[in-house]
């Protein structure tokens, strides 16, 4: 009986801790993926429907590298506060994987808190045309980064969700951050394609498959990222869309 009471107390305390975390950060969910790499998920509404946006951050011996940003500027400060609370380190670098607000919307904020901000030259050009905040530093489509003892690579596979979408590869962890060019395995369609290049998308995904065939985890840009069938599902969705387009012509 005493043993059962102890177990009940432990479970109750665990649930209380989880609830407290949720109350402090109702719009930001952080999950450890592998080693010092974490997936963070934020939520926003598009056309009346609530969606999750996924990205990652890497804890290095020099500080924290954030890929993309929380979806919505109202979440920026609580996100960086939570990072400091969890790891005792500040964000020192931010990289946007394309020009949309759920990826590049935090460039100004991260710059203001002292982080170095980066994007490709293609993304920078789009942001400039749209009169939006831009990164402090730009690079050509492919670039390798080394921060302290940690390394990762930015790779441009070709056009897809947008003209400028890139992916990020963490070789030690064997994790690929697909961003919005990779659809979640539970996606019903290609989502927003107002700036997409659907006819190029398939080849771009094949380029990703070939270059990062050793990936153990692929983090899709939206919704469920844990189902690792996301790359194949993306190809299926593209094909489905193209077949419907042919049938309607």
Curated annotation (Swiss-Prot):
Subcellular location: Periplasm
InterPro entries attached to this UniProt entry: Beta-lactamase_class-B_CS, Metallo-B-lactamas, NDM-1-like, RibonucZ/Hydroxyglut_hydro
Entry GO terms, CC: periplasmic space
EC number, as in UniProt: 3.5.2.6
Gene it is expressed from: blaB1
SS bond list: none
Regulation: Inhibited by chelating agents such as EDTA, 1-10 phenanthroline and pyridine-2,6-dicarboxylic acid.
PROSITE patterns in UniProt: BETA_LACTAMASE_B_1, BETA_LACTAMASE_B_2
Protein family according to the UniProt entry: Belongs to the metallo-beta-lactamase superfamily. Class-B beta-lactamase family.
Cofactor: Zn(2+)
Function in brief: Confers resistance to the different beta-lactams antibiotics (penicillin, cephalosporin and carbapenem) via the hydrolysis of the beta-lactam ring.
Pfam families with a match to the protein in the record: Lactamase_B
Protein known as: Metallo-beta-lactamase type 2
Binding annotation for Zn(2+) 2: 102, 180, 222
Organism: Elizabethkingia meningoseptica (Chryseobacterium meningosepticum)
UniProt-annotated binding residues for Zn(2+) 1: 98, 100, 161
Reaction it catalyzes: a beta-lactam + H2O = a substituted beta-amino acid
